[in-house]
Amino acid sequence: MPSLPHRCSVLLSFDLEEFDIPNEYGANLNGEEQLQVTRNGMQQLLPLLDQLQAPATFFTTAHYALQNKQQVKALAAAGHEIASHCLYHSRFDEKDILQSREILANISGQPVNGFRMPRLASIDKNLVKQAGYTYDASLNPTWLPGRYNYLQQPRTVFRSHDLWVMPASVTPRLRLPLFWLAFKNLPLSFIKQCSLAVLKKDGYISLYFHPWEYADLAGYTNLPFYTRRPCGNQLLQKLSAYLQWLKSLGHFTSFSNYIHLHENQLLHSS
């Protein structure tokens, strides 16, 4: 395999959203509980990011931001990127694409350049472009049974509808995904092996997780085991080991900063 590029980039992202996944499996969590579980996860997660000095991109629902304005302002002030995860996580209207961007920009004081559709659902990129975004991060170019099949889509950053499309990383040949469920359920040694293959091939890696994963989810027994365990501190320790290893191989950067630094190269290769 080829050697690692001199400066690998780690694009770390979190979907900062309501903890509504139990309701997909028959629960009836109210809105405040959904928000509080995510807050609990953020309390666990943020000290780790501070310790590692790891800037991340937080794809944030405008609803969460409106209920947690000081936290979102603090994220922006700490050097993290605030991007849009639409208005709500559980329901969608086309007008939410623009409205969420305006709300998040107003709260964070940052330009909001990026969009990620909840549950990585398909989205008309013309709508994303018209709402003023410069990139879309709604693509996981793999096959996830019951959710989506994007095996024919490009694996790495590409241009479409005058937008940058920022896929989540998958391995070069088999397209094994490196998203949150894989990280939660597979051995760290295997995740590192797959990550190394991506870094050697692509020169960067794009990852996404959820803050609520780092809260205590033991009581949500209606969730499938593979989405619920490990969680809390146990999962945080695994994430810590993984991120420290990635830091030894490269540097953390936001999605917008990666595009800014590599735009000429990306345009040439698109």
Go through the PLM ranges and name each one.
Residues 2-78:
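Active-site beta->alpha N-cap acidic-glycine motif
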Residues 4, 22, 106, 110-204, ...:
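Active-site-adjacent pocket scaffolds in enzyme catalytic domains
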Residues 15, 49, 58, 85, ...:
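Conserved, mostly hydrophobic/aromatic
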Residues 20-21, 65-68, 91, 123-126, ...:
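Short catalytic/ligand-binding loop motif for oxyanion handling, primarily in non-cytosolic enzymes
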Residues 30-36, 60-61, 86-91, 112-113, ...:
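The substrate-binding groove and active-site-proximal loops of carbohydrate-active enzymes
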Residues 52-124, 133, 138-139, 170-172:
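Metal-dependent polysaccharide deacetylase catalytic core of the NodB/CE4 family, i.e.
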